[in-house]
């Protein structure tokens, strides 16, 4: 189906290598989101993988693809329109935020990852910008952007260096300075830990304007729970994060294990998190400055192919 079958409206999103428009399908009058990707800015293999993944996935907490087509220099992905906007853009406007709300968001993310990992898909770029809300009125999450994702099998493990620095797992960073070592879907679980930490206090566990210091803190999992911001957060929540921000990937909780953690199953704390609103606003300013400063450098594109090797235990 050519682009002429759609009426383009306003731009609703922009990434390092793509632009997203609100569109209406002329025949059905239904609205969709159209992601337009410049072929010159992305590798052919990466684009093919993203399309293959989008065709394959079907889960209530993952943005669903309607169809795709291409021109000489562009790829067009027509996907489900989610109208709630990026998660953090929405919650930054809330006057208060509770541990229960953070749990419900994390739970939905975990459900999407249990599904993805069960069919051999690793997202590899979990960050707040890739978590969208389906409607403006609730906190139903939809995971998006599979541009760096990979399909893996039992005997295929990743060695490429990609992701977003503040959220990337230690084993991925190790591939920059050391001989590449294999890693698995555990990289996604580190991202869940970082996102959950931010949801509960409004700032990230790892941050430095000096990227070398940032990497050092990630590689050693140097983070804490400052009492001024974490004093009212449950011990179960802290334990949950500790189980995910574990340097050794084989000791890190899987998506299924995390979904069965007591914090996810039992937590119902509705007391507003202290200082949360001020901190999340400050963090959003920092994220925007990072994007302006680094631009595409915030995302590492794959620089090697997956390899048929077993991971080192």
Curated annotation (Swiss-Prot):
Covalent S-S links between cysteines: none
GO CC entries: cytoplasm
Domain of life assignment: Eukaryota
Molecular functions per Gene Ontology: ATP binding; myosin light chain kinase activity; protein serine/threonine kinase activity
Stored Pfam families: Pkinase
Alphabetized UniProt keyword annotations: ATP-binding, Kinase, Nucleotide-binding, Phosphoprotein, Serine/threonine-protein kinase, Transferase
Role of this protein: May phosphorylate a specific serine in the N-terminus of a myosin light chain.
Family, per entry: Belongs to the protein kinase superfamily. CAMK Ser/Thr protein kinase family. CaMK subfamily.
Name of protein: Probable myosin light chain kinase DDB_G0292624
Organism expressing this protein natively: Dictyostelium discoideum
